[in-house]
Amino acid sequence: MQIIHDFIRGGFIMSYTAQYQKAVFDVLNSVFTTEAEKIDRAGAALCSSFQKGGLLYVFGCGHSHMISEELFYRAGGLAAVYPIFETSTMLHEGAAKSSRIERMSGYAELVMERYPIGENDCFLVVSTSGINSFTIEMAQAAKRRGAYVIGISSGAYLSKPSRQKDGLHLPDVCDLAIDNHVPAGDAIVQVCADGTKAGPVSSIASMAIANSIVLSACEKLSESGTEPVVYHSGNCEGGDKLNEAIIAEYQKRIRCL
């Protein structure tokens, strides 16, 4: 998507925050307009998985791991979500180290061996660049186990060289690839004279896509006569009690509950 960089409106230059807000709206509008059919297909796949007793596994490296947290154990979130929190690829145990590990080949299979993902499950993998070995090989490992693989990445990186040994990009190995319409480099507001930008948009875009997939699945479940199992807010009256029943049902299948 071509994001408009002419931020002069009404004879004055828009502030950085106004530029950012406009760019966020532009990205989300592009996503919801262009990717609607794919989001609907992802929702259908997820609905089918749940009807067969499957789970939604979610994975991302670095900041993309936040999408796993976004969908897991939260008010309004589906119960049948199994996040893959691989701490070596998260920032709290060494940010620079996580970047190096994300580019490693051969580690993904060791991670996937710890999870009982199978043919009734869906696997949502998020990587805006979609060029690093770990994420691509996680998607491949999930496919080998029979899961339906949904990828979220940016089409802006398809022209960039992949770091994966076979030159693959994330969309190449997914059953369904959804474009988050994030520009290469992620940040969108120029803040330095040399062209350096701030204000990343990938987390907002990818979370919006992920929650849209969830809502699509909920709608399809409801239409088929099955009420989706959704967590309640523990900060509202009665929420804890309702959630206790959900946890009791799923904690044997989802270790991190």
Each language-model region and where it sits:
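Generic N-terminal amphipathic, Lys/Arg-enriched alpha-helix
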Residues: 13-34
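Glycine-rich phosphate-binding loops that contact phosphosugars or nucleotide phosphates
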Residues: 57-214
